[in-house]
Amino acid sequence: ATTRCDPTLIPIAGGWFELLEGGEALRYRCPPGHIPTPLARRSCGPDGQXEPLXXXXXXXXXXXXXXXXKCRAVWCPPPQDMEHGSFWPRLPRYPPGSRLHFQCFQGFNLRGAPNRTCGEGGRWSGVTPVCDDGSGDCPAPPVXXXXXKEGSRYLLEDTVRFRCGPGLVLLGSAVRQCLEGGVWSGTEPQCRAPLSFDTPSDVAASFMASLSQSVERADSNSSHGPTEKLPRXIRVDGSAXLNVFLLXDA
């Protein structure tokens, strides 16, 4: 007999579900700005009951069972105090659609996005803004929302350290060093909430940024022409993360 999910045994608080594979599995759906927890997809057994609700606990590296599925709100983390600048409005957390505005104190120039919007996936749009006066060998390093930075010297071989607030996970380099050429080692750190995720627009923006930097760029100090395609390379150090996205055209 064909296994089918029993609709009376698989509700989700605040959302709905759709049956897949002829009723042998289901996918939970939530309103915009929310995500199904502890999982988004379930399979059903011969008796029509769905598999147990279990999610991996990062801290204990074990699975924790939940009594019922529910839709939980996704929030963007609040920024820490901006070095040599300020931002508004100041809230404990920001729902999708919220906007932040940044400005620098006198004598400092703003690099990055002066305005950022909280996306549906719990991530801020645009480039992390920093206030820089040009006095260091390296520019002021970006400090992502909810990250704290240790170190305020940006001369050659100086290092800065980053950490995230409680309940957030650091992705990227926890330690960065000012290198020759005025660049920082590693990758920009991000503090991500456990429920945040990459939306299709986030993925598209990442691809476009990568292509614009490596496919058709003109180097005034080399023999490359303005439209000559250059080799594309991916550099990942020991403390960085590499996200691989697979796109399937159905």
From Swiss-Prot:
Family (UniProt): Belongs to the peptidase S1 family.
PANTHER family (alphabetical): COMPLEMENT C2, SUSHI DOMAIN-CONTAINING PROTEIN
Single GO biological process annotation from the record: complement activation, classical pathway
Source taxon at top rank: Eukaryota
Keyword Signal: no
Protein's UniProt name: Complement factor B-like protease
Sushi domain location: 3-73, 74-133, 136-193
Keyword annotations of the record: Complement alternate pathway, Complement pathway, Disulfide bond, Glycoprotein, Hydrolase, Immunity, Innate immunity, Protease, Repeat, Secreted, Serine protease, Sushi
Sites where a glycan is attached: N115, N221
Compartments it resides in: Secreted
